[in-house]
């Protein structure tokens, strides 16, 4: 039985195993607090994310379950990796991942980025997205603060808690609006991997300019700003709008022509502008895919088709449409024990999954 130690961080109780010491707050999100810590077993710094009250509602239970399954499934150099999971006696859940020193948002607000860093960061973002998309996963909330970077400029995409959620209420968040694809704003329902390419394009443009490309005050203003640069959406895109109110709004906007991006990004490499043109396309079907973007001339210094892997298998989304009570979502506890046992099997050559899972399920029965 693990020994738990309590600490107060920003008025929040962190109840973690004694394996992790030297807690320091590094970030606070809508669904949890993140601290840095020292792993006494490995001697390495780690990030410990507390999911507060994960079983308080069915929605939050499902969200936590989704993030856990995704972190277990997605194994890639440009995706944050999960090293430990535990549930405290207070029934809070803690995810332990590798610790990276900063994120892209902090970098962008501290200094302009040189060309080689912009290239390398974009390459790694797209390399990660190629893998994620091949697994049948849409991140959906890609933004600079979800892109972690260490002192060696290694980059990892994090925060998959919102992946593949189709929830219009989430679209009101100011922090994510700037990077949101137009098809999400226009239809609020059907979208696919192309939304992440749009977000990556907005991040790319921000790296080039040092400021957000589409800093809308609200969704109406956001869409107007987009059309000022990219012109009025094509008729076939407008025809996909499902909301009558949105359709009336779009048709009421003045007709605008697409502006050459070279006129806005005057100091950028022509190859950078060309790639951005291919990423910032209204019609998602015509937007460049991650694998195609990796092969673009702008990323030639880093592109290596033999080292840009795809997922071995698709992610199992069968649970995602389930509308279950909190007690049923507590099956995630068995997943946590399963994760530990798989790691132990890799180290010690033995698996004790079945008994541990049974014990975990009984504990929450």
Curated annotation (Swiss-Prot):
Q: Does the keyword Transport apply?
A: no
| Keywords, comma-separated and alphabetical | Activator, ATP-binding, Cytoplasm, Kinase, Nucleotide-binding, Nucleus, Phosphoprotein, Serine/threonine-protein kinase, Transcription, Transcription regulation, Transferase
Cofactor(s) needed for function: Mg(2+)
Where's the Protein kinase domain? 20-299
| Record's comment describing the protein's domains | The TXY motif contains the threonine and tyrosine residues whose phosphorylation activates the MAP kinases.
UniProt family annotation: Belongs to the protein kinase superfamily. Ser/Thr protein kinase family. MAP kinase subfamily. HOG1 sub-subfamily.
Q: Name the chain's protein.
A: Mitogen-activated protein kinase hog1
């Amino acid at each position: 039985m693990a020994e738990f130690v309590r600490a107060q961080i920003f008025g929040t109780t962190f109840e973690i195993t004694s394996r992790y010491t030297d807690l320091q707050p590094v970030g606070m999100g809508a669904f949890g607090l993140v601290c840095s810590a020292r792993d006494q077993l490995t001697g390495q710094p780690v990030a410990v994310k507390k999911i507060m009250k994960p079983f308080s509602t069915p929605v939050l239970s499902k969200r936590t379950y989704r993030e856990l399954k995704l972190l277990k499934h997605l194994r890639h150099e440009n995706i944050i990796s999960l090293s430990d999971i535990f549930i405290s006696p207070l029934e809070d859940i803690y995810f332990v991942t590798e610790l990276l020193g900063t994120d892209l948002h902090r970098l962008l607000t501290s200094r302009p980025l040189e060309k080689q860093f912009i290239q390398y960061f974009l390459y790694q973002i797209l390399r990660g997205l190629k893998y994620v998309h091949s697994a049948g996963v849409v991140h959906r909330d890609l933004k600079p603060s979800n892109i972690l970077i260490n002192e060696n400029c290694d980059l990892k995409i994090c925060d998959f808690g919102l992946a593949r959620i189709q929830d219009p209420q989430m679209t009101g968040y100011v922090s994510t609006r700037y990077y949101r694809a137009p098809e999400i704003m226009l239809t609020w329902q059907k979208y696919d991997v192309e939304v992440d390419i749009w977000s990556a394009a907005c991040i790319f443009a921000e790296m080039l300019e040092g400021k957000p490309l589409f800093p809308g005050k609200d969704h109406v203003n956001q869409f107007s700003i987009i059309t000022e640069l990219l012109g009025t959406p094509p008729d076939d895109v407008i025809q996909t709008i499902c909301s009558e109110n949105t359709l009336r709004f779009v048709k009421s906007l003045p007709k605008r022509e697409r502006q050459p991006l070279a006129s806005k990004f005057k100091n950028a490499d022509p190859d950078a502008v060309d790639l951005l043109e291919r990423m910032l396309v209204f019609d998602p079907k015509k937007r460049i895919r991650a694998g195609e973007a990796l092969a673009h001339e702008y990323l030639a210094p880093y592109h290596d088709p033999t080292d840009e892997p795809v997922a071995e298998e698709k992610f199992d989304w069968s649970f995602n449409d389930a509308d279950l009570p909190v007690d049923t979502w507590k099956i995630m506890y068995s997943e946590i024990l399963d994760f530990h046992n798989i790691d132990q099997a890799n180290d010690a050559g033995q698996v004790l999954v079945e008994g541990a899972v049974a014990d975990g399920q009984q504990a929450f029965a």
